[in-house]
Amino acid sequence: MARITLRQLLDHAAERSYGVPAFNINNMEQGLAIMEAARASDAPVILQVSRGARSYANDVMLAKMMEALEEMYPDIPLCIHQDHGNNVATCLTAIQHGFTSVMMDGSLKEDAKTPADYDYNVSITAEVSRLAHMVGASVEGELGCLGSLETGHGEAEDGHGFEGALDRSQLLTDPDEAARFVAETGVDALAVAIGTSHGAYKFTRKPTGEVLAMDVIEKIHERLPDTHIVMHGSSSVPQEWQDVFNAHGGQMRETYGVPVEEIVRGIRFGVRKVNIDTDLRLAAAAAFRRVADTSRSEFDPRKFLKPAMDAMSAVCKARFEAFGTAGNASRIKVVPMPEMARRYASGSLKPQSARSEAA
């Protein structure tokens, strides 16, 4: 099985009405944990890499690691995705290193801190789409800024996130504007703002429609029934792993993530890609703490890393099952990037027209 583009994978997910978790990766242990879970679940995989991860691990190391994972798990369709690209160069160098998909986040300017206006977002996202599609790579865009509807603030992740406070209109994607954006940029997937944010501290209470606007997804799907919607900041921050973390010396304050059942609801309304990072970090860190606390003489890193990998795999398997991803890897016949490039050039992959409100 070869590497798969995000567009082909999400097209398949739409045809079969499932969602695909996109797990952030920094190192070998995360990669092995995710791929083992995928093999056990017969699930296709999206491994995504932030700019911070590229800086931490180095592009050469990441590229070789992805090659190794592809070779070790030949039956798993593997999409390699740049998360939150901040400029054209970030996206193109990712493709240069073997990524099959990139996100151009034009909701913020190049500093990844300053909210951008609509015209800037359209201009830079359309340029990345034009260039990426020439070589068959997929593009995800973002409209609206990720941040909390409770506080108006965002949470920076690897240096990416707006500073200060925004009003509610800036923190929610407008469905009509979304229809224009997809038509003007040609993106393959659209990340929307609905009140989720990066990191562990998303909500101070179990989220309701007041702070997690799932109705926005339904309205966008109604306007854009053929567009693949992406939910960012969608870790569920499992209570059981919070408890393990704190039971063994951690100091995580009370917090709530995005409930799995709400994500499943989103999948019914066009959500095809679900970004998850904190859940794997938390599971791994909790497993580390448990070993350090219960085996205080232990100093072999493998004795810490193996339980951490098992913990991450368990989270991945649960998400593959809940989102309906399980059982679909073996159903996919990968289309090579040169063929995807030909299809883009022919216009056959052009976004479908939005459904009008009157329709």
Swiss-Prot record:
Its cofactor is Zn(2+). CDD domains: TBP_aldolase_IIB (cd00947). Catalyzes the aldol condensation of dihydroxyacetone phosphate (DHAP or glycerone-phosphate) with glyceraldehyde 3-phosphate (G3P) to form fructose 1,6-bisphosphate (FBP) in gluconeogenesis and the reverse reaction in glycolysis. It comes from Rhizobium meliloti (strain 1021) (Ensifer meliloti). Homodimer. GO terms for biological process: glycolytic process; reductive pentose-phosphate cycle. Zn(2+) 1 binds at residues 84, 198, 232. Zn(2+) 2 binds at residues 105, 142. This is Fructose-bisphosphate aldolase. The active site is at 83 (proton donor). Its EC number is 4.1.2.13. Pathway: Carbohydrate biosynthesis; Calvin cycle; Carbohydrate degradation; glycolysis; D-glyceraldehyde 3-phosphate and glycerone phosphate from D-glucose: step 4/4. Keywords: Calvin cycle, Glycolysis, Lyase, Metal-binding, Plasmid, Zinc. It comes from the Bacteria. D-glyceraldehyde 3-phosphate binds at residue 50. Belongs to the class II fructose-bisphosphate aldolase family. The lineage of its organism: Bacteria, Pseudomonadati, Pseudomonadota, Alphaproteobacteria, Hyphomicrobiales. It holds the Pfam family F_bP_aldolase. Dihydroxyacetone phosphate binds at residues 199, 233-235, 275-278. One of its GO terms (molecular function) is zinc ion binding.
